[in-house]
Structures are given as structure tokens and as C-alpha cells.
Amino acid sequence: MPLVRYRKVVILGYRCVGKTSLAHQFVEGEFSEGYDPTVENTYSKIVTLGKDEFHLHLVDTAGQDEYSILPYSFIIGVHGYVLVYSVTSLHSFQVIESLYQKLHEGHGKTRVPVVLVGNKADLSPEREVQAVEGKKLAESWGATFMESSARENQLTQGIFTKVIQEIARVENSYGQERRCHLM
């Protein structure tokens, strides 16, 4: 029986970008058309990747804006982040840049495990942010970029699988930097 590894992931983004819908679709396998603003919810799910099992603890946050102060609970003990914007809102994309900077400053690390998600891809006729813009931003951070649709269950599983992989990648890269070589 494989060892179950605990991973805490915080989902951040501007309001009404679909953070709750992504988490709910991933954990419950369903999409809710109704919208109640989130204060803060948590979800848990066991995810198997290869031979490894992960207890994924998701923190679904209330919408942030560029002036939001991120509480320490969004930084301390957190392994990775899913930063979500809506492809139908340029403002939500701009807020994501500010949130990433706050995370980066809060962690004091050069690398923070992040998956950048352009959600609501099913609403392409209303698109304000092109996929190439999201990809370029993610590349500048050294992060992964994905577009999704919580409504159509497009890549919801892949987002959270990818954040687990990003956490491992960043943890392994720090481990390599700290190795001592005796000669």
C-alpha cells in the first residue's frame, strides 16, 4: 500500500472567475449553475498518480483584487497554488499578476509551485484574454498554463494533477540545489 502524501493547495483569483466551480467539478464531478459568493471552503480528494497517492486538501478562497492582503494561512503550510482568471475578463487577468507578486513576496522563494488557469474557455465569443497571453505570463513565472471550462469539465482533473506535479518539480529542484559535494 503506497504512502499517502498530504498536499495543501490554495485556489486564488478575482471574484466570479470560477474558482469554486473548478474545485467542485474536480471533487464532486458536477457543475452548479447557481452562484453564491464564497467566503472560504475546503475540499479534499485522494488522487493517485502512478504508484503515488496524494491527499489533496483544496482551499477555495473568496475572490481577491489587486488590493487584497493575503493572509498567512494562504502561505504557511501551503504546497502549491492554482491561480484562476476568466478568459472573459481582462481585469481578472491583471489581478492575477498582482496576486502572484504577493505570493512570491510572501514565500520569499524564487520558485512557487503554480498552475495558471484561464477558466470559462467555453465562453470564447466573449473572450478578452487570448490563450497566448496566459501562456506568456505563465512562462515568465516558470509556471504551467492551462485553459479550462468548469462547466464542460474541460481539464479540471488535469489542473489538479498538474499542480501536484509542479509541487514535486519545485521541491526536487530545491533538493538538488542544497546537495553538498565532497571532493
From Swiss-Prot:
GO BP: positive regulation of NF-kappaB transcription factor activity; small GTPase-mediated signal transduction; TOR signaling
Cited PROSITE patterns: RAS
Protein residues bound to Mg(2+): 38
Effect of residue 54 to A: Partially deficient in guanine nucleotide binding
Enzyme Commission designation: 3.6.5.-
Modified-residue entries (Cysteine methyl ester), positions: 180
Membrane protein topology class: Lipid-anchor
Binding site for GTP: 16-21, 32-38, 63, 119-122, 149-150
Compartment list: Endomembrane system; Cytoplasm
Major localization listed first in the record, in broad terms: membrane
CDD domains for this protein: RheB
An MF annotation (GO) of this entry: metal ion binding
Matches recorded under Gene3D superfamilies: P-loop containing nucleotide triphosphate hydrolases
InterPro entries: P-loop_NTPase (IPR027417), Small_GTP-bd (IPR005225), Small_GTPase (IPR001806), Small_GTPase_Ras-type (IPR020849)
Stored NCBIfam families: small_GTP
Quaternary data: Interacts with MTOR.
Protein name per Swiss-Prot or TrEMBL: GTPase RhebL1
Gene it is expressed from: RHEBL1
